[in-house]
């Protein structure tokens, strides 16, 4: 089962209540926040409902490892370190990321890891408008493997 990275692109002004509730269920309360979800029909329905405010795609293990290493936070706002992952799970961050992508483990298996990754705005900006879909040359909606390039620019 693939993992999807979901990033909130647009703000919270004039957001309809069902979309706002969906974004809250995804824990995307602020712009440039990222969460990792499973590729299941229930999550895909939520993503479709909020597609005018988010972008998503399949994340790879290399990008997930960089995301955890650079932007992962533990409760108490402490950074995730190789030593912490080694102590709790007995493996490196790269091995953990690979197991998460393969579905053998979940991000919840790392104790005290916050589920939301706070990212910077992308270096070089969004290509095109923040109000149009990715297929139309904007920034919103499904972007497949290209989500990895966007996350690299936002780390």
From Swiss-Prot:
Q: Which SUPFAM superfamilies does the entry mention?
A: Ribosomal protein L30p/L7e (SSF55129)
**Annotated GO MF terms:** RNA binding; structural constituent of ribosome
| Keyword terms | Ribonucleoprotein, Ribosomal protein
- Indicate the transmembrane segments per the record: none
State the Gene Ontology BP annotations. maturation of LSU-rRNA from tricistronic rRNA transcript (SSU-rRNA, 5.8S rRNA, LSU-rRNA); translation
Q: Name one GO cellular component term.
A: cytosolic large ribosomal subunit
Judging by the UniProt lineage, the source's domain of life is: Archaea
Quote the HAMAP family the UniProt record gives.
Ribosomal_uL30_A
Self-association state and partner proteins as the record states: Part of the 50S ribosomal subunit.
Report what the protein is called: Large ribosomal subunit protein uL30
């Amino acid at each position: 089962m693939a993992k999807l990275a979901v990033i909130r692109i647009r703000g919270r002004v004039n957001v309809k209540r069902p979309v706002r509730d969906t974004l809250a269920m995804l824990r995307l309360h602020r712009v440039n926040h990222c969460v990792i979800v499973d590729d299941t029909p229930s999550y895909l329905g939520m993503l479709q409902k909020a597609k005018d405010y988010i972008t998503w795609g399949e994340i790879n293990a290399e990008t997930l490892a960089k995301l955890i290493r650079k932007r992962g936070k533990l409760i108490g706002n402490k950074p995730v370190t190789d030593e912490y992952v080694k102590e709790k799970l007995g493996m490196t961050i790269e091995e953990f990321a690979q197991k998460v992508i393969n579905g053998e483990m979940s991000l919840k298996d790392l104790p005290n890891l916050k589920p939301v990754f706070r990212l910077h705005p992308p270096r070089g900006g969004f290509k095109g408008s923040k109000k149009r879909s990715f297929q139309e040359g904007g920034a919103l909606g499904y972007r497949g493997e290209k989500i990895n390039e966007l996350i690299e620019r936002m780390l």
